[in-house]
């Protein structure tokens, strides 16, 4: 099983980043949910991953993980920080604009958007670490 995951880790990471990008765009432009500043930072980390992971999966080039792993770890850190903002009472961020970074918006009735982001970035990071070496 682990060999299967390692063999297709780039494809799985790409699929997760595509799903995250599509859900983010859906919430912003279809449901008109205005993102907070931390959500924008997470998008800055996520959106390029979709393109880069797609190209590297197509080319079976796992050496790209050296360049995109820090970006995924940064996105994970930002999303963990936002979960703390939402879950720890009294924590507030001064840079939040019109939309508070601690406002909870739920996916599937029980998972907040930042928690879904933690899961997505965490899975991408794990998959990049497990990626089978193809070239290089």
UniProtKB/Swiss-Prot annotation:
Keywords: Cell inner membrane, Cell membrane, Chaperone, Disulfide bond, Electron transport, Membrane, Oxidoreductase, Redox-active center, Transmembrane, Transmembrane helix, Transport. One of its GO terms (cellular component) is plasma membrane. InterPro entries: DiS_bond_form_DsbB/BdbC (IPR003752), Disulphide_bond_form_BdbC (IPR012187), DsbB-like_sf (IPR023380). GO terms for molecular function: protein-disulfide reductase activity. It is a multi-pass membrane protein. It is found in: Cell inner membrane. Its main location: membrane. One of its GO terms (biological process) is protein folding. It holds the Pfam family DsbB. Disulfide bonds join 36-39, 96-101. The keyword Membrane applies. Gene3D superfamilies: DsbB-like (1.20.1550.10). Signal peptide: none annotated. It comes from the Bacteria. The chain crosses the membrane at residues 7-26, 41-60, 67-84, 109-131. Required for disulfide bond formation in some proteins. Belongs to the DsbB family. BdbC subfamily. HAMAP family: BdbC. This is Probable disulfide formation protein. It comes from Chlamydia pneumoniae.
């Amino acid at each position: 099983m682990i060999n299967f995951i390692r063999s297709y880790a780039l494809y799985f990471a790409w699929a997760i980043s595509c799903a995250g990008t599509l859900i983010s765009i859906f919430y912003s432009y279809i449901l008109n949910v205005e993102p907070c500043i931390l959500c924008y930072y997470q998008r800055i980390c996520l959106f390029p991953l979709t393109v880069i992971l797609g190209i590297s999966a197509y080319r079976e080039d796992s050496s790209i993980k050296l360049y995109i792993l820090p970006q995924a770890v940064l996105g994970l850190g930002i999303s963990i920080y936002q979960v703390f903002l939402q879950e720890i009472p009294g924590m507030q961020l001064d840079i939040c604009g019109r939309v508070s970074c601690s406002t909870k918006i739920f996916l599937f009735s029980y998972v907040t958007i930042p928690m879904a982001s933690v899961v997505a970035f965490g899975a991408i990071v794990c998959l990049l670490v497990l990626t089978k070496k193809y070239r290089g």
